[in-house]
């Protein structure tokens, strides 16, 4: 059975103190750290890149911190070597941003990273079927990518359910609008990796939120037949 993974999104953290934010989330029990890399072309916003990932990695070993790097950039293949050298744990590219899907998967694996493919809300899940079994994770966006703090889109969850039923050992991640109010729907559909930004970083007790998100996934794993 796939494991529940909670990945606080550093996009909602204090960018002037990212090293401390990583440590804070690890202390509160996060499994992964979700790192949003945006180029102001594939999405409107501009965030951080390999240099910042490397700066964070200098403070935490790969055993201490798992950096789940979500690339919202055009031609993500340009960043494989840079992010691998920076210490990224997982390289997640957008299906819509490239035509070199299988090349990216192969090259990123060769560089020692796990590989994921992300789908925008309007992108059908069927497009990844030719290479999905080569992936370590599929990210189903539950908001339009590029901006934090948006509302959860439950209409994206049939893609999660399809993937969980067809590929029971695949990591299925959801990102966008996840909170203690919305996580049950995502977990029940089959998501095991939960990205949450605002809900965690802006909470009075981030530790309780992380625990609650994980408990939701674990409860679904106990009760839903497609997790068996």
Swiss-Prot record:
It catalyses: D-ribulose 5-phosphate = D-xylulose 5-phosphate. The keyword Signal does not apply. Gene3D superfamilies: Aldolase class I. Pathway: Carbohydrate degradation; pentose phosphate pathway; D-xylulose 5-phosphate from D-ribulose 5-phosphate (non-oxidative stage): step 1/1. Its cofactor is Co(2+); Fe(2+); Mn(2+); Zn(2+). One of its GO terms (molecular function) is metal ion binding. One of its GO terms (cellular component) is cytosol. The keyword Flavoprotein does not apply. Its EC number is 5.1.3.1. Keywords: Carbohydrate metabolism, Cobalt, Iron, Isomerase, Manganese, Metal-binding, Zinc. Binds 1 divalent metal cation per subunit. Active with Co(2+), Fe(2+), Mn(2+) and Zn(2+). It comes from the Eukaryota. Pfam families: Ribul_P_3_epim (PF00834). Substrate binds at residues 9, 70, 146-149, 175-177, 197-198. InterPro entries: Aldolase_TIM, Ribul_P_3_epim, Ribul_P_3_epim-like, RibuloseP-bd_barrel. GO terms for biological process: carbohydrate metabolic process; pentose-phosphate shunt, non-oxidative branch. It is an enzyme of class 5 (isomerase). HAMAP family: RPE. Catalyzes the reversible epimerization of D-ribulose 5-phosphate to D-xylulose 5-phosphate. Belongs to the ribulose-phosphate 3-epimerase family. PANTHER family: RIBULOSE-5-PHOSPHATE-3-EPIMERASE. This is Ribulose-phosphate 3-epimerase. It comes from Schizosaccharomyces pombe (strain 972 / ATCC 24843).
